[in-house]
Every structure is written in structure tokens, then in C-alpha cells.
Amino acid sequence: MEVIDSQVHANQRGIEQSIAIMDAVGVDAAVIDIWPPVRQKLPNGIVRFDYAFADEAVARFPKRFAYIARFDPNDPEVDDLMAQVRAAPGRVCTRIASGFDFKILREGGHQRILAAAGKHGVPVMIYPGDEHAAVTAYVRKFDAVQFIIDHVGMGVDRASLPEHLESTIDQLLTYAKYPNVAVKWGHAPRLSRQPFPYRDLISQLSRVIDAFGVNRLMWASDYTVTVDHHTYAESLFCLRCADQLSESDKEWLLGKTARAVLRWPKPA
């Protein structure tokens, strides 16, 4: 079974250490999201993002890494930049995550990015926070865009997440009717009220699989951020060892969905 982690901030550990950590838990490949982003401000105030770390990781370990591109929603050249995403080795998608400043999301300020993503076939990872109405409006308007809901759509108040396990999943399921929406099953153990292996969470995962189909769900660890709550191994093995999931479910959730949705073919 190929295991793909669809979000890691590998720049926080470095390339060699990231490879060692992946090997230790049994992860074959990972999608890098450089965080914090390396920004370059142009004279006109527009921000561009530097991918030197990810480019080096992909060049050195093309079978192990891909990465996420980011764009300034006000960049007048975003269409041209988006057109280059799929041409760059290892660059598979973009991400809308506003650093927990959701004003631009509420105001619909990502129209230019989403229009370009739809035009050029670039999947868009998006973290709704508590702005599900705004994200749903995007999903409806930009139906040619492949959206991926980050962090199972959980709210921003991490301390109260276990209180909202069922309601978080209920909210997530409202996206299932939109065929252009997939889900990143990341940070999910934070929702559990139980210790590893988080059986209450796995029961909720079964609901998500029934609603979306497992071919629209991909696992992510985000382990540099979730280390305050659970380990990298716990994030993975609560799924690998889950009796409620079939082997086919695990294959899709842990690898095949990421390959298919991100259009990231397995290297020969």
C-alpha cells in the first residue's frame, strides 16, 4: 500500500530530516506546503512566493515530494502564474489559507485565483475555518474547480473541537453533494474525545466515506503543527489499523485519492 501525506510543512524540519521522519513512520511520499511562506514583496505591493526549498526537495527526491503553490489574490498576473503550476516539476495544486485572517474569504476576494485555477485545471486546497457559507458560494460558482477542504473543515477554536465532533462532520457532509469537492482528512484526531486509536473519530470517518466516497478523501498529517496533540505515527496508524475500514478504503484514503485528485502520477 502506497502511503501519501497530502500536507507537510517540511521546511520546518529540512529535507533530510523530513525523509528520515517519513521513513520512520512508513510514508512513501508527501506534498509540501511551505509554512510560513517565503514572501517577496514587489514594488507595486503584490506578494510573490518563493519555492526554493520545495524545488530542491523535488529535484533531489522526485519520488518522495510534490508541493503546493500560493498566490496573492490581488496579483494581476495570477492567470499567467497559474498556467505555470502544472508545468513546474512537482507542483500539483494551490492553497487558499488566509493565515486565520478570513476577511478576504468572507468578502469573496479569491475570485481571480479561482477563475485561473478552473481555467488551467489546478486543484485548490481551501481552509474554511468558520466561513463555510463563503466556501460553499465558491464551490457553487466555480464548479470547474477541484476543491479540497482542508482539516476536515474544522473550526479555528482548537480547544473546543472535541465538543463539536459530530457537528463538524455534519457540516463537512454538506459539501458531499458537490462533485467538485474532495476532503483532506488532516488534524482529524483533534476532534476525538478518546485516546489513540480514536475510535469515535473512525466511526465519523465511516459517515464521511459513505457520503463522499473514499475516492474523494485523502489523508494528511500536518505533523509539525499537530505535534502538540498527537504524533505522526498516531495520525497514520489510527487509519492503517482501523478495523472499520476495508483494505480498499485504506488504499484510497492513504494514497490513491491524492494521486488521482492532484493528478500526480506515481513515478515509474
Question: What are the language-model segments listed below?
Answer:
Residues M1-R112, A116-H120, K184, R240:
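Mid-domain alpha/beta scaffold segments of enzyme catalytic cores
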Residues R91, K103-M218, K266:
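Catalytic pocket-lining loop regions of alpha/beta-barrel enzymes
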Residues M22, V58-P62, R86, V139-R140, ...:
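N-terminal cationic-hydrophobic initiation segments that often serve targeting/anchoring roles
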Residues N11-R13, P37-Q40, P73-E77, D101-F102, ...:
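Active-site environment of divalent metal-dependent phosphoester hydrolases
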Residues V8, S98, V152, S221-Y223:
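Active-site metal-binding loops of divalent metal-dependent hydrolases
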Residues A59, Q84-R86, M154, L201-D210, ...:
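Short, electropositive alpha-helical surface patch
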Residues M1-S6, R13-A29, S206-R207, A211-M218, ...:
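Mid-to-C-terminal alpha-helical segments outside catalytic/metal-binding sites
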Residues F71, H187-A188, L254-T257:
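Acidic carboxylate-rich catalytic motifs and surrounding loops in phosphoryl-/glycosyl-chemistry enzymes
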